[in-house]
């Protein structure tokens, strides 16, 4: 109840991100992208299709699904319009990669403060643990720009499950670092988990339970 989003009277939702750079096994982004790659770009061959539209990461010898965003100015102008026309007092930005798209998010936050929206229209969004673990300064930047919460899909605290089933590129150490950073910035952590993953046993589940308790 301390979150401003719970007290908002005129709440809006915004989404600007198209696609996702991650390949999480359980997510509809991944499933739909694979179908599109196969049907449109790969001439029936999914791997050939992936190579055509994925961004090569030569250091890690992997591919990432591309994602697209409008300009930060466009996003801020959207929220200004919603404030002026509908008098919103909170906006939920449901883009999933605001903590990893650092350049975009920093520019967005700067413009948001410049327009005074950080005081009149607080906001919340989604993020990912690996990016916060490596670039924790993004949390303070977002908080200073009016960000009230960031929801993270932790999924599991078992490295085995994270590696074999989730395949998001995150480890338990990333989860802990993210929580530590949020606590330092006095932001309430919002996290989601899944149980019943294909390779998960009771020991893996208890790792996650122990993580919750700690």
Regions found by a protein language model. Give the residues of each.
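Radical SAM [4Fe-4S] cluster-binding motif and immediate context
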Residues: 2-190, 197, 210
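Short alpha-helix in the alpha/beta-hydrolase fold that links the catalytic acid
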Residues: 204-208
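Glycine-rich phosphate-binding active-site loops on the catalytic face of alpha/beta enzymes
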Residues: 214
